[in-house]
Amino acid sequence: MIAWLLSSFFVLLFLGVPIAMSLGLSAIGGILFLGGGSTVTIAQRMFEGMNSFALLAIPLYTFAGFTMSKGGISKRLMDFCYSIVGHIYGGLAHVNVLSSMIFAGISGSAVADTAGVSGMFMPEMVRKGYSKNFTVAVTAISSTIGIIIPPSIPMVVIAGICGISTGKLFLGGIIPGILCGLAQMIVSYFMAKKEGVPKEPGHFTIGPVLHGLWESWPALLMPIIIVGTITMGIVSPTEAGVIAVVYGLFAGGIIYRELKWEDIKFAFAETVRTSGRIFIVIGAAKLYTVMLTTAGFDKWVAKTMLGFSTNPTVILIMILLIFFIVTMFMESIATLTLFMPILYPIALGVGIDPIVLSVLITVVIGVGLVTPPVGMCIYVACDLMDVTVGEVFPTLVPFIAATFICIALMVAFPQLILLPTYLMA
């Protein structure tokens, strides 16, 4: 049974069959032809995977992000970030990263950040003398902060699968997101020096910063509202998503008065497409995971890993490597839905903190989003600038290396993840 499930899935995947279809067909084949259970379980298990109140936050945060990006915040956000870091060598690259860090607190999606706010920087960066490869690389890698700094769609999925507090996960992602952003800025500085990019004119002054802060305060306030209301126990993550939607409509339509009815229809359509794809993958992955568990795959994985080592750090590194490798070939949501139910109990069994594990997995998944052959963010960024992944990837390697250094620091010092939770407690 295990051999069929794994071999049929990977054959379908490499033939180009969509991930949800590959998972579903492999699982259904096991049920129909190998006696893996009743056909009644197909619909039951798929519905069971999607039937989670916590997962309702996904379309809500997605819609809020689209409405904020369409409601006039993008240009104001760019100006605010430029007033802070634009004077540093490689200024536009730093603005790109800082904007992604702020937009991460709005959308919770790396791909949305790549195609949205970060995508707006690329033509301007090329016009100012940045190479296309550098421009695409910094845009793709900075967008991965979108799933680390709260709110985060992958964290919502993890919380729904493992029963972890979404609020604690959101708090755990704050320092790692900032750390990864600073690392990307350091790499951007030296790469800009190497490329001989002209330095932006002017120097840091407080006036433009205060003006930019006044213009962009509605966007800056949203992540504070979301994380604050959740961690204070006022609302659940899903209810906070409703607040984010109402606030996004209010900010774009009333405060900025730039959100049009066409923009709302676009945001709604994109939310339906994005959320529909995610939920279909979650349902199919749930069915596939149940079949793997029925076949004893989880016990085999646990026996193999614990037979190699019972040291928590070693097990943690092994789990992170598994997620990194798998995310290179599969969508992040499918990877989480498949492997979290299998690997999470192993991690708990050796004493790994669930918040530390979940945040580190989220960061690793972000690296997978910019790593070929299936890195979604790198392909979106390359399409926007009409370059190939092969051309961009060598420029991307230093950014990936910097992210792995950040991961190593977090593995060595998990307090970087847990500190906000301790402070709130």
Residue ranges, per PLM feature:
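Alpha-helical transmembrane segments of multi-pass membrane transport proteins
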Residues: 1-425
